[in-house]
Amino acid sequence: MTVPAAPFGGDEKHLAPARSAVLWGLAAVTGLGLAVRFASLGVQSYHHDEVITVARVIPGSFLDMLRQVKGSESNPPLYYVVAWAWAKAFGTGEVGIRSLSALLGAATVPVAFLAAREAASARAGLIAAAIVAVNPMLIWYSQEARYYSMLVFFGAL
């Protein structure tokens, strides 16, 4: 009978410290991803595309929002459905609405880790997570009240 190899390399007695180090590393990289996305979230006012999002999610009722999205939006409605609920909970200011995208962008960091760990190793996972955490383009789109971060998040899954 063969015993499967430890998922982080090495034998069983070294497994716990290695796993702990990887988890702490992932937590640090994810924290960095959160920090850089939320640091300047409300610095700029809404731009044209974001105004479209706000106009879709501000209507009073859920059905009003769906009617607006159905009648004038070419993108799938999932982002607007989630953003509508998010705006009800966190407000319609720049930080309130953009925080959904920032959170989705930061949540992509551990997803990148899991994908790279599955494909290669825990070390590759940490490198991939670090790249996603500090990638300027991903940070930029994580600070916009648009569906881009949700698209990247689900694409990474």
Stretches found by the model and what they are:
Residues 99-119:
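Transmembrane-helix motifs of polytopic, lipid-linked glycan transferases
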Residues 1-20:
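Membrane-interfacial, low-structure loops and terminal tails that flank and connect transmembrane helices
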